[in-house]
């Protein structure tokens, strides 16, 4: 094998973990709230459930918390484990809601790579115009083969303190 080909191949494999991190519409890092071990492994990291928090980048004072499994073992220790797709989500209003800009139904709030092989988890937002409720959906998918694992959370827009009437999410939808 020629030296230049070997070097190119080695460089590609070294860059894969960086490429797998992804970017996306919402490039914020989630806040790790806590991890809880679910499977004990003697010499390698345990399997865990991890709970994270993220703020909606467009809707001020709405926060989402999600929990997903993180594989341990040898493959998990080196970031090579195929992560399972199970996810759960809870979003809530944490202050008076204000919108920074208009948004479309299904806009990405947050996304993150979950494996070396193009699986990602993402949170998207919608607006139930009739009920004035923001609806958040988290799901995990692969580049080729999607996943039915998902969870939904609804945030009714309510008055906060002396702020008066809450904004109507329908007024902020791109049409």
Go through the PLM ranges and name each one.
Residues 27-88:
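N-terminal secretory signal peptides
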Residues 10-14, 45:
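An N-terminal low-complexity intrinsically disordered segment enriched in acidic/polar residues
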Residues 61-128:
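Mature extracytoplasmic domains of secretory-pathway proteins
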Residues 30, 98-175:
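Low-complexity intrinsically disordered segments
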Residues 54-56, 69, 94-96, 141, ...:
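Generic structural motif
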Residues 1-11:
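Bacterial N-terminal signal peptides that target proteins for export
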Residues 16-24:
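C-terminal segment of classical bacterial N-terminal signal peptides
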């Amino acid at each position: 094998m020629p030296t230049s080909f070997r070097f190119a191949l080695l460089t590609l494999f070294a860059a894969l973990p960086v490429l797998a991190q992804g970017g996306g519409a919402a490039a914020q890092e989630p806040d790790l709230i806590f991890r809880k071990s679910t499977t004990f492994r003697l010499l390698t990291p345990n399997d865990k459930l991890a709970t994270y928090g993220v703020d909606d980048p467009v809707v001020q004072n709405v926060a989402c918390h999600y929990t997903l499994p993180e594989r341990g073992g040898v493959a998990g220790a080196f970031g090579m484990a195929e992560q399972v797709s199970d996810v759960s989500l809870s979003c809530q209003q944490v202050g008076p809601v204000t919108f920074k800009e208009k948004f479309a139904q299904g806009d990405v709030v947050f996304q993150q790579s979950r494996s070396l092989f193009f699986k990602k988890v993402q949170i998207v937002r919608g607006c139930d115009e009739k009920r004035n409720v923001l609806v958040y959906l988290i799901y995990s998918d692969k580049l080729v083969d999607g996943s039915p694992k998902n969870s939904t959370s609804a945030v009714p827009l309510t008055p906060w303190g002396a702020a008066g009437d809450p904004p109507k999410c329908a007024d902020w939808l791109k049409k």
